[in-house]
Amino acid sequence: MNRIILILLFFIIKVNSQEIAINKDSNNLTLDGNVEFADKNLIEAEKFYRKSISKDSLNIKASYNLANSFYRSELKQEAINQYKSSIEKTKSKETRHKSFHNLGNIYMQNEDYQNAVNSFKNALLNNPTDDETRYNYALAK
């Protein structure tokens, strides 16, 4: 009986340590992407973010940052899709707010005012104190 418990304990520890290693690799790739993004090497940043997401599909920072990279590269449809993905993955009100806010900005640039209004409204639901989002919401209306 003790032997079975030890085997199960060993198995749980092994699986947990592998998961930690994967998360660490994914986070390191995200950090590398952030460096490239800051240096305006958007293609390289995109590569690192994609690698990070491939290691950990629930890495919300990499998903959100990939959307920002697309947005900065003016790949609007890709940015829209990636922001929507980061919204679906996260429970963080801050990330949801920023994603919806940026979606609203893209829709405004595309003159899609109805989607812009909806995006800014959702951003305000996640952060009602943001004056910039409130201003953009009024402008889109």
Q: Which residues are covered by each model-predicted region?
A:
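Residue signature of alpha-solenoid helical repeat architecture, marking inter-repeat boundaries
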Residues: 23-24, 57, 94, 135
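Alpha-helical segment of the N-proximal tetratricopeptide repeat
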Residues: 22-51, 55
